[in-house]
């Protein structure tokens, strides 16, 4: 795989050493299958999470362009917005966050606790909107207004999910391949599939590094029919920028996100409690809980290609546990 193409893109180092890849012995015994976990929840900044991998590339590009302000968007409890704001604070940049309330709740914990509380600690400028119906256009409109105030804004898309941001998960695939070498022969990888950048970056990287490994994206906000074109579009854009081919099919399961994005469900919450009680690992109600519910049910329903070891990508999100109390 011509990874030298990745060096063409400016990159800041926020993460340092590879995140741990760990065996989960008690969960493995419980499920009757070898389960491993990639701990992107323990990245170093602001309670961790996967978006730092994307921000290493995106914020480097922002600084190259001379930006002094990062603008992004997401839900009130967005992990991506929290990590973007933290990076901005670390680098002395201004951060403007365009937020929506996707579940229409008036619950005080959701509106003020968890990730939203952390945004205030990072001195984030908050702009509320009724809904992110066209986030790219809404972010551009906001950037124009911020620029008129004398700032030099750089727009980071929802979830950091552009071809540039997703380079972080092409690199993650290399990290996984190196960590698994001569240790475990993975059969499948499971990841939450939302804004699609993490999923697409892994798809490109794993196709070239571990082509026999099955990659399953568990959707957290959309049906397969809605999500698959988003993942494929990013997959092809990433491959194009790296001068690679990307022919691997995109596998998605959409049975686990109902009743909708950001709304906890019973299977997801059971998965959160199971990982906490068996392994001391904290999942969240929005992304990783639902993705783990998919992994658990996938084993039960024999949905995986074979009975080999499974790697779960832990993308973070634990701050949302506090926002979703008393569901937790």
Swiss-Prot record:
SUPFAM superfamilies: Tryptophan synthase beta subunit-like PLP-dependent enzymes. Pfam families: PALP. The keyword Lyase applies. Its cofactor is pyridoxal 5'-phosphate. GO terms for molecular function: D-cysteine desulfhydrase activity. The keyword Cell membrane does not apply. Its EC number is 4.4.1.15. Keywords: Lyase, Pyridoxal phosphate. It catalyses: D-cysteine + H2O = hydrogen sulfide + pyruvate + NH4(+) + H(+). Gene3D superfamilies: 3.40.50.1100. One of its GO terms (biological process) is D-amino acid metabolic process. The modification N6-(pyridoxal phosphate)lysine is found at residue 51. NCBIfam families: ACC_deam_rel, PRK03910.1-1, PRK03910.1-3, PRK03910.1-5. Catalyzes the alpha,beta-elimination reaction of D-cysteine and of several D-cysteine derivatives. It could be a defense mechanism against D-cysteine. Homodimer. Belongs to the ACC deaminase/D-cysteine desulfhydrase family. This is D-cysteine desulfhydrase. It comes from Salmonella typhimurium (strain LT2 / SGSC1412 / ATCC 700720). The lineage of its organism: Bacteria, Pseudomonadati, Pseudomonadota, Gammaproteobacteria, Enterobacterales.
């Amino acid at each position: 795989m011509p990874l030298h193409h990745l060096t063409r893109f400016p990159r800041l180092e926020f993460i340092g050493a590879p995140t741990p890849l760990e065996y989960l012995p008690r969960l493995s015994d419980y499920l009757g299958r070898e389960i491993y976990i990639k701990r992107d929840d323990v990245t170093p900044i602001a309670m961790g999470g996967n978006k730092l991998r994307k921000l290493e590339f995106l914020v480097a590009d922002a600084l190259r362009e001379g930006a002094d302000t990062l603008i992004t968007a997401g839900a009130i409890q967005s992990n991506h917005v929290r990590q973007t704001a933290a990076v901005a604070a670390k680098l002395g940049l201004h951060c403007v966050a365009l937020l929506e309330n996707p579940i229409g709740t008036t619950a005080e914990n959701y509106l003020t606790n968890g990730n939203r509380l952390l945004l205030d600690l990072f001195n984030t400028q908050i702009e509320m909107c009724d809904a992110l119906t066209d986030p790219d256009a809404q972010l551009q409109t906001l950037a124009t207004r911020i620029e008129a105030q004398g700032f030099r804004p750089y727009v980071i898309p929802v979830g950091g999910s552009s071809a540039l941001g997703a380079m972080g998960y092409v690199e993650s695939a290399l990290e996984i391949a190196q960590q698994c070498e001569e240790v475990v022969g993975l059969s499948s990888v499971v990841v939450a599939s939302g804004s699609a950048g993490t999923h697409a970056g892994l798809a490109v990287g794993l196709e070239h590094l571990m082509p026999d490994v099955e990659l399953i994206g568990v959707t957290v906000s959309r049906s397969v029919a809605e999500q698959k074109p988003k993942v494929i579009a990013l997959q092809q854009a990433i491959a194009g920028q790296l001068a690679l081919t990307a022919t691997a099919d995109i596998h998605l399961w959409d049975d686990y996100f109902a009743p909708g994005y950001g709304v906890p469900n019973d299977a997801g919450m059971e998965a959160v409690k199971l990982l906490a009680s068996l392994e001391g690992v904290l999942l969240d109600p929005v992304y990783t809980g639902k993705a783990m519910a998919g992994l658990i049910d996938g084993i039960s329903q024999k949905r995986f290609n074979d009975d080999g070891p499974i790697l779960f990508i832990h993308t973070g999100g634990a701050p949302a546990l506090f926002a979703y109390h008393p569901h937790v």
